């Protein structure tokens, strides 16, 4: 099938966010073209595909911060999946095609062309996107015009970085990650009700944390996420020289996980990435929606990336469908999407900041109170954000969401004595700067926070065949 010259909606990027957007809009009978640069090995009815594929179910998560059950209301559907990311992306990409989108992999968008907007437009953007140039891995080139554009291009974020120039970084969450796949690891919680579940553990020196996630193919993903500056300091003082050796040395700093890996062997080479947290001043402009990592990224903690990608993908689809159907003007539709992404990002950022502060504080109380051994009370409050139910209509009340935001805001604000962050002796000079940055972020988010995804009296209408926006209080 040849890449067409015209589409109603062009989606750049076939990851979770882009594939979700494409699936949701294609099911509405809207003409969708989905372009993905790489070649791949509930609303869009993907659940059954994941269930039948054999991914390991993630019923709960446990960690050294607390042996805490993240299930909100136990039941048949209160689980997620531990997935091989490439296989997960492939399933979602194919689902978009099966839903009616014209999907092409191995095709990279190299440039976006814009037309000037009306003089009445006051937003700071290059204009209305009207076409895109592409290049395929086999050497073919071409262009495609469209009415609407969705940028789900991942961290490259072509719209934010190249045209809108709206990306900013959060220096407190400048992390580096390294991970590998192990065979023969002892499952976590053998002989208990949580046997085989993922486990997350803070490093003993407070420099980061380690994940331990069993996969359906018999391997276990083990990754180390570490503050970049602290990682640099540790490498300088370490006796090892290779990245692989430093990864293995770092894993030893997680006592429980290192024990689980005693009988295991590292399968293949380790992988590395810079996990720098960033966000944007807006997540779109007229006829443009920005989704997932293309607009914002926080941290692997609590799997925030996938949730923000999928919820943002649905938000983009809802707002585009609303614009096409005339539910509201386009300037209202794109701003509804942008505000919703900002709200969800803000909620998750506060929770991740609180967890990160607790990791670095080690034994000092951040998410708990003096004398409290665990963090069950804290997670009972922030659970709606971690699970994403804060973004699902009718699942939790606005009061519960607001409580989670308030709790997280208070947790990451600087304490009066400035003693909540405990770092290695070599990095104690970072304390005052870290405290101030976290306080500034918390204050800004708390000030800007809105407890529901309602903009100018509009909320999502999640009905197949009439996807779009409706006035708050209107049935159907």
UniProtKB/Swiss-Prot annotation:
Recorded E.C. number(s)? 1.14.19.-
User: Pfam families under this entry?
Assistant: FAD_binding_3, Trp_halogenase
One MF term from GO for this chain?
catalytic activity
Q: Which UniProt keywords apply?
A: FAD, Flavoprotein, Monooxygenase, Oxidoreductase
**GO biological process annotations for this chain's record?**
ochratoxin A biosynthetic process
Q: What induces it?
A: Expression is positively regulated by the ochratoxin cluster transcription factor otaR1, probably via its binding to the conserved 5'-ACGT-3' bZIP binding motifs found in multiple copies (3 to 4) in the promoters of the OTA biosynthetic genes. Expression is induced by sucrose, glucose and arabinose which repress the gal4 transcription factor, a negative regulator of the ochratoxin gene cluster.
The answer, when asked if Flavoprotein is one of the entry's keywords, is: yes
| Metabolic or biological pathway, per its Swiss-Prot or TrEMBL entry | Mycotoxin biosynthesis
Chloroplast recorded as keyword: no
Q: Which positions bind FAD? A: 14, 17, 306
Top class in the EC scheme: oxidoreductase
Q: Which reaction does it catalyse?
A: ochratoxin B + FADH2 + chloride + O2 = ochratoxin A + FAD + 2 H2O
**Where does the chain bind chloride?**
304-305
**According to its UniProt entry, what is the function of this protein?**
Flavin-dependent halogenase; part of the gene cluster that mediates the biosynthesis of ochratoxin A (OTA), a mycotoxin composed of a chlorinated type I polyketide dihydroisocoumarin moiety linked to L-phenylalanine, and demonstrated to have nephrotoxic, immunotoxic, genotoxic, neurotoxic, and teratogenic properties.
Which family does the entry's similarity section mention? Answer: Belongs to the flavin-dependent halogenase family.
The protein's name in its UniProt record: Flavin-dependent halogenase otaD
Species annotation: Aspergillus niger (strain ATCC MYA-4892 / CBS 513.88 / FGSC A1513)
Source species taxonomy = Eukaryota, Fungi, Dikarya, Ascomycota, Pezizomycotina
């Amino acid at each position: 099938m040849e890449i067409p010259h015209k589409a109603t909606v062009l989606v750049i990027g076939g990851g979770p966010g882009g594939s979700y957007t494409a699936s949701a809009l294609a099911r509405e009978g809207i003409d969708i073209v989905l372009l993905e640069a790489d070649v791949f090995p509930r609303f869009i009815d993907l659940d059954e595909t994941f269930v039948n594929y054999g991914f390991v179910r993630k019923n709960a998560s446990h960690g050294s911060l607390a042996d805490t059950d993240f299930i909100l209301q136990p039941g048949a559907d209160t689980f997620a999946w531990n997935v091989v990311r490439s296989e997960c992306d492939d399933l979602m990409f194919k689902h978009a095609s099966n839903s009616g989108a014209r999907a092409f992999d191995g095709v990279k968008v190299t440039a976006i062309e814009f037309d000037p907007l009306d003089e009445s437009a006051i937003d700071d953007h290059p204009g209305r996107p009207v076409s895109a140039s592409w290049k395929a891995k086999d050497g073919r080139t071409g262009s495609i015009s469209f009415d609407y554009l969705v940028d789900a291009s991942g961290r490259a974020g072509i719209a934010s970085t190249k045209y809108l120039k709206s990306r900013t970084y959060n220096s407190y969450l400048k992390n580096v990650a390294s991970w590998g796949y192990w065979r023969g690891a002892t499952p976590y919680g053998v002989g208990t009700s949580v046997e085989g579940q993922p486990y997350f553990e803070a490093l003993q020196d407070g420099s980061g944390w380690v994940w331990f996630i069993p996969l359906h193919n018999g391997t276990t993903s083990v990754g180390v996420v570490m503050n970049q500056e602290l990682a640099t300091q540790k490498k300088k003082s370490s006796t090892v020289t290779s990245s692989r050796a430093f990864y293995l040395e770092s894993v030893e700093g997680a006592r429980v996980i290192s024990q689980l890996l005693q009988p295991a062997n590292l399968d293949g080479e380790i992988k590395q990435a810079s996990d720098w947290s960033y966000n944007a001043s807006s997540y779109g402009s007229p006829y443009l929606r920005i989704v997932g990592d293309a607009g914002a990224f926080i941290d692997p903690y609590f799997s925030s990336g996938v949730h923000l990608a999928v919820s943002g993908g649905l938000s983009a689809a809802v707002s585009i469908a609303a614009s096409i159907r005339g539910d509201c003007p386009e300037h209202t539709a794109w701003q509804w999407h942008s505000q919703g992404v900002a709200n969800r990002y803000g909620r998750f950022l506060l929770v991740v900041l609180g967890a990160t502060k607790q990791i670095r504080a080690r034994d000092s109380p951040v998410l708990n109170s003096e004398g409290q051994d665990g963090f069950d009370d804290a997670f009972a409050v922030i659970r709606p954000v971690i699970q994403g139910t804060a973004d699902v209509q009718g699942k939790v009340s606005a009061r519960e969401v607001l409580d989670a935001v308030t709790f997280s805001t208070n947790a990451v604000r600087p304490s009066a004595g400035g003693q909540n962050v405990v770092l290695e002796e070599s990095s104690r000079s970072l304390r005052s700067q870290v405290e101030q940055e976290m306080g500034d972020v918390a204050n800004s988010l708390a000030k800007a926070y809105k407890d529901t995804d309602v903009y100018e009296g509009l909320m999502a209408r999640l009905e197949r065949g009439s996807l779009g926006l409706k006035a708050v209080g209107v049935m159907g």
